[in-house]
Structures are given as C-alpha cells and as structure tokens.
C-alpha cells in the first residue's frame, strides 16, 4: 500500500505513520492530537458504534459507561470502582488541552443512552506519558459514587497477559458501519487476540498495546474509544485506535490493561 492509497491525514503525521502497515485513527468523535503534536480533522464521520455484532441486553455489560460532552456521545469507558471510570486518554483532550471535568457527563446502567444514571466528573487524569498513540489511558473520578445494582457494577482488571487466539468481547455505542446510521443502543461483538509480534508489526508500538482482529466489517469504530474489551469478566483492553477504516482486515489497537494496573491503582490511591 502506498501513501497515495491511504486515507489522507495531516502531513506532519505521515512520516511516522508510514512506518506501520496502515494509517491509524483514534476512535473518539473529537479531534485528536496526532503524532508530533499536529492536529487534523479525521476523514471519518462523527458518531460511531461497534461494527457488526448485536444489540446488548439490559444488565449484560454492567461495567459499560458512556462519556457525553455537550449531551453528545464522545467515548465509552468502564466502571472499575464506584467512583472511578477507566477510558482512553485521547477521549479527554481537546487539541493539546485536557478538557474540564465539568464538560464530561458519565452515563451508566442502561444500554440506551436516553436512560441510565448520570454522574458529573470531579477529576480528569490522563496518563502523564500519553502521546503518539502510546499510554492511551485516563481515569475519571466521579463527583458521586454510582449505586451498585444488576445494571451497574465495577469490573475487575486483568493483571496478566492474554494468550493469542483468545476471544474477547468488545462493546460500544454509535454507527454500526462506516457512514451508517447512529443508534441509541449499546452493541457488542467478538474479536480475537493477535500475537504480540503481529501487533507490533501492524502498529509500530511495542509495549502497552493489545491488538484484536475480527472478520471484515466487524470490530471497533469511531466513537467506541475508551470502551472495554473483556475476557472472563475481566477488563483486558481499552479501545484506542483503528487502522485504515472501520471494519477493515487490519487489527484494532487497545491499551493492554495488565500493563497499566500499577498506574491505575497508584493514581486512585492519590485521591
């Protein structure tokens, strides 16, 4: 594939992105800081959901939350304690600046964005080494705890690596295919863990990342950023980016949760 064949992106990013197998795009609906600090409007539609898959039932993913800004879906996230949400770092940036906590509302407890329990955010904490698609995780501390129920429940963090070939479940809201209609309902799909070497070759990132593949026209898409990948009721990944386009044959990049457990626990203890 030549650069001319790829979706156009900021010129400042091309030198870095040419090192990998395809052009990477964050999965949020906001404009992101690209490698080198340049900004560009991604050539993708605003709004997205898991490509393919099925509509979730109430209580099926009690850890899943949505992040709203201006009453519009921005990203997903996972409840890991009653007052803490784990999401992607690029979900909490506007250009090079971290967005105010007051601009984010977290919705939990329903597969419908029109329902559920809403909580204001007290504190936004992106990983201090986030950049160039690396360390793409952030914590949100809620102003008030979320009540525990059959529909709202924190998920455990995976503390060990996930074997290649394992099947995970990914979930999120938005469009079911590139350019398709937006849904108000949470969707989920299955994906397969890629071997670490294959992940590195596809992304150019050697640490802190886990890659998943799905059949063509399945997988994560813009708007699913920050959302979970789970295995055996444990959170194993945080949605970060896609390569080339939604539902492509290329692997999707997720932050590897086991690599960030120490950072997560240390950060939460500080507040």
From Swiss-Prot:
Protein name: Serine protease SP24D
Domain Peptidase S1, residue spans: 50-269
Enzyme class name: hydrolase
Name of the gene: Sp24D
Organism per entry: Anopheles gambiae
Gene3D superfamilies assigned to the protein according to its UniProt record, in alphabetical order: Trypsin-like serine proteases
UniProt xrefs under InterPro entries: Peptidase_S1, Peptidase_S1_PA, Peptidase_S1_PA_chymotrypsin, Peptidase_S1A, Trypsin_dom, TRYPSIN_HIS
The EC number(s) this enzyme carries: 3.4.21.-
Disulphides: 75-91, 199-211, 221-246
Cellular component per GO, a single term: extracellular space
CDD domains: Tryp_SPc (cd00190)
A Gene Ontology molecular function term of the record: serine-type endopeptidase activity
Propeptide residues per the UniProt entry: 23-49
A UniProt-annotated Pfam family: Trypsin
Listed GO biological process terms: proteolysis
């Amino acid at each position: 594939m030549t650069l001319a064949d790829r979706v156009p992106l900021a010129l400042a990013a091309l030198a870095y992105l040419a090192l990998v197998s395809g052009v990477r795009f964050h999965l949020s609906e906001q404009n992101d800081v690209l490698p080198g600090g340049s900004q560009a409007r991604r050539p993708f539609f605003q709004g997205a959901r898991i490509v393919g898959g099925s509509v979730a039932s109430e209580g099926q993913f009690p850890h899943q939350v949505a992040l709203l800004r201006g009453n519009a879906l921005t990203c997903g996230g996972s409840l890991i304690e009653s007052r803490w949400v784990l999401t992607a770092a690029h979900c909490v940036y506007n250009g090079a600046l971290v967005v105010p906590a007051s601009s984010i509302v977290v919705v939990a407890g329903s597969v419908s964005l029109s329902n559920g329990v809403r909580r204001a955010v007290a504190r936004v904490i992106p990983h201090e080494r986030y950049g160039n698609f690396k360390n793409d995780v952030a914590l949100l501390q809620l102003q008030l705890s979320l009540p525990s129920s059959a529909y709202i429940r924190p998920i455990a963090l995976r503390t060990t690596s996930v074997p290649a070939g394992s099947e995970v479940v990914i979930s999120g809201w938005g469009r079911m295919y590139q350019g398709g209609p937006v849904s108000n309902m949470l969707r989920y799909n299955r994906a397969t863990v890629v071997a670490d070497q294959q992940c590195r070759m596809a992304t150019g990132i050697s640490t802190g990342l886990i890659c998943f593949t799905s059949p063509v026209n399945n997988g994560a898409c813009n708007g699913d950023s920050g959302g979970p990948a789970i295995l055996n009721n444990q959170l194993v990944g945080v949605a970060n980016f896609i390569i080339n386009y939604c539902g492509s044959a290329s692997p999707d990049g997720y932050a590897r949760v086991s690599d960030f457990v120490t950072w997560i626990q240390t950060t939460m203890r500080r507040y």
